[in-house]
């Protein structure tokens, strides 16, 4: 369960970073 949660957190974190990066690019454009 802990390992699964860590995986979920890692994927969630990556998604948030991608969304933030996309938002930054959008702001620059």
Curated annotation (Swiss-Prot):
Example of a GO cellular component annotation carried by this entry: ribosome
Gene3D superfamilies assigned to the protein according to its UniProt record, in alphabetical order: 3.100.10.10
UniProt superkingdom: Bacteria
Gene Ontology MF, one: rRNA binding
Pfam families according to UniProt: Ribosomal_L27A
Entry keyword set: Ribonucleoprotein, Ribosomal protein, RNA-binding, rRNA-binding
Subunit and partners: Part of the 50S ribosomal subunit.
Family: Belongs to the universal ribosomal protein uL15 family.
Physiological role: Binds to the 23S rRNA.
Protein name: Large ribosomal subunit protein uL15
Protein species of origin: Streptomyces lividans
Gene that specifies this protein: rplO
């Amino acid at each position: 369960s802990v390992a699964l949660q860590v995986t979920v957190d890692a994927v969630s974190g990556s998604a948030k970073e991608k969304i933030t990066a996309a938002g930054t690019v959008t702001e620059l454009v």
